[in-house]
């Protein structure tokens, strides 16, 4: 029977904008994320062109990996990490995005990080652009809407590829690139918000601008991949998709067709371009219906053909249902992708519906479509952790969530899926990208940092730390119920109470 491969890449995932902090240290510039205020589940964060005195911008300090990287990497090694997903902050290398020469202090920082990972034989998995678009490029070009950004991106890519060619093997070009197919992608992913001041949920939606920006990201990704294939054959280049698995709300053929349409636009379009090297025919009708006309230059199609990915990665947190019935109003509150609540699934406190079986289904669908090695590079449960007086976090609800998803990954491997690794999101507590809060915690490691900006940043191991340590030690077999830490009856009760019906 097929099991997780012996060289399976167990680890954890982070992003510089949510974790690194030190936003203006050693010559770093401001990114789009640095211009986002704090928020909550009920009050959306805002983006401001100018920094407001007295307003908290949580990404500026985050949980301070910049000054704690040795301690944090030691914790990752203690758990047994084989891979460490992180991003390079573009603005630490090119502060405004438009400099001719890179910032040496920024490059030296990542040298130190990669050397520290190598000390523990941990493989870095580096996202080149993970919501760290220089704000200078927003002001100059309206973010990725400006084709000029491609050249600035490639200058950045050329520098980091050359600098870290002997230290990094696995690269991802853009984080959750398909978020640009949805209005929410305008802020962090595309940066098409020049002059906007207000809640991130109220940015005026302009599909023409979003999809033109996506076209420029496709070109930038393909150029980076071709450069890697031609000059650095040791590199393995991947994409990263936000996979929002969708089911028909009913077996009504109208619902099935609506689900197919949404799956194509949200989940398949971007990866079809990045994996196959061309625009799929189904997108033509969508563009016609929306009045979208992509401005292409001669040679664009060839660039896309020559820059396809080596492996496919994605985030998986939830699923949702789609319906063609306008009378159905049961929306999934808090669900990043909207859509209709699935009555068969429970949800987290943030309304994200929990669907472990959906991960197995998703892995099979992606594998059947592309026949490329796959990696789940984000997955996890955002929760309000309680710190006991003796410094413990009994997060049995997180263990329950993760063990069920790992079990379904194992089933997908038995189905024949080529799965190369797993990096749960926010293995150490980081700032939430969607809400800008610290209260929504994912980590195996608790960081004493709070929504009012206070906290001494000390790191504490949660119960899930020891559980995941055992999962890695046993190459996934330790994920089954009864393995890892023992749970008390009160902890089981806590886990049951955590979930609610969506």
Model regions: which residues?
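Active-site region of glycoside hydrolase catalytic domains
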Residues: 1-53, 77, 96-98, 107-501
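Alpha-helical scaffolding within the catalytic cores
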Residues: 68-72, 298
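Short, well-structured secondary-structure segments
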Residues: 82-89, 123-127
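Active-site mouth loops of central-metabolism enzymes
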Residues: 54-67, 145-147
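Glycine-rich, proline-tolerant flexible connector loops at the mouths of alpha/beta enzymes
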Residues: 88-102
